[in-house]
Amino acid sequence: MDEKSQFSESVVQDLEQMHSALRQVMTKLSLPELPPLQSINSREEGSPPKDDHANTSHHLSVSQEEFRGPSCDNSPKATPEDEGLPYVPIHSLYTLTKLSALRSPDNPEAQKGNAINDFIARGALSLADAESLFSLYRDRLDRYMYGIGCRYMTLEELRRKSPILSAATLTVAALHDPKADNIYGICSGEFRRLMEKSMFERRIDRDYLRAMCVASYWLSDLSWMLSGYAIRRAAECNLHNSYNQAIKEQSQEAADCARLWYILYICDQHLATLYGRPSIVQEDSSIQGWEQFLKSPVATEEDKRLTGQVMLVSILRNIRELFGTDKGEPIPRVYLNHILQFRRQLDEWYTRWMGELPEQWTQIGSFPRKGTILHYNFAQIHLYSHIFRGLSNDAPIPHYFLDCAMQAVNAATAIIDLIITDPDVAVGIVGMPSYMLSMTAFACMFLIKVAVKYGSDLIERQRVHDLTTNLVRQFRSLKAGKWHLANLMAGGLERMTATLATPDLGQVQPAVYNNAVEHVDMVMPGNQVYTDMDGDTFFDYDMSFGLSPVFRFDPSMFTVDASGQSLPTYPEADYGMRPQ
């Protein structure tokens, strides 16, 4: 880069700072807002300012950009004795090249202007609709994410501070609002547009990361991609080091960053569990030191729930690391001791957090405690369902894993039973993260597969039929948006439940659970093939168990409405399994 280009870049940065300061002064004096700098718009859009010679300017801009190459920082020349030995290798390359892309991005918050130029201002979404959606998110939905997603109390402030967080917030709210079906696509499209536009933007802030946290937590169609990208960008901003600063300096700003890092960790572990893929975030001091964070002066009441989830997903992470990826091989008997150890850890987690969380919570009632029961059973079914790995259609369950098989069935049953019988949990369906709904889908499919493959050995078909039928009825009664996972799941579950009505004529009835029988070595499988009247295979999907890929059943069943038409896609009552 030549000196002239460096000088021009420095001038532009100086102008941005002066323009931002002047805007703040104008706002304080209640004077009209200044228009945005044309140079900023040009750089953001990747094109020069429009004028009478647009084509000529465009060609000149391209040639100049190609000539200049990657952007570099204009800083004093360093000498070898200026600093100590570099502790990160990339620092050496940055010292030699001054490439801007090699350093952590600047904090852009001080350079933000106050002009509002978003899809609401452009008329794509009415202000009244936006206010309604924002109120829904602020007053209710954000509590399901521990109060981390809503930093601002008014929509106007949110729009001024972060258009992308505004779009993410309104998208999630529209997903849950049954009156917002016609505007969900508008909000979702705007969020996707802003994400695409900012993919290579160097300057990001906490609200940018917060927007990706919100989307990763609720938007199942974007969560896998956004979660991984958000973790990378958060690492660039040293978000993972905020924990130490929050503890030592008792900084609320650092505590906010630490909470965002915890949410990213939770989403990462949730997605790794759902997809059976490796997680990205490893356990560092901030993850291992969640108790110190909870005891620090910066901790809030919501942090109890947050750190409780950090503790739980760390157990899930260890479970995944033990079993690894599904290679189609049976689980060795020696793993039984590990399973029992994990069971004790889950029991301890359940006992602790059921005791620490209060009966009622602001705006979401008793859902946190009932959610603890759900999460406990989600973890149980995830743990015990591994014993079905590698069992072919004619392979029995090894006798030493029979108790684990029953525990998995009991956990799945408890999940569905709690959702259909507890009114607080039923209300919480419209608000809970996509992970919880996905694990509910897994519990349903697990029971259906068990009932088909093993008949009444583990659970009666009629019991599964009744549970899933009632769950479908519960989902259809919810006041949620058309694109909410519960509505998308209802049609698919209804069709899968119908398969249980097929008579099980050839089912062999082994006496594997007869108390008079000792030293039972196996559970006899049910019919290997079910045929319809034409003799075709009735159940032709993979009957093996596992979470990857996506529960081993056709995900298209969740993308149709009640009529079977394809849905368009947009770019202390103990209901659980108390530990014994």
Spans of features found by a protein language model:
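Active-site oxyanion/phosphate-handling segment shared across diverse enzymes
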Residues: 286-292
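Conserved amphipathic alpha-helical interaction elements at protein-protein interfaces in regulatory
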Residues: 24, 28-31, 175, 236, ...
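C-terminal, low-complexity intrinsically disordered regions in eukaryotic proteins
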Residues: 18, 27, 31, 35-114, ...
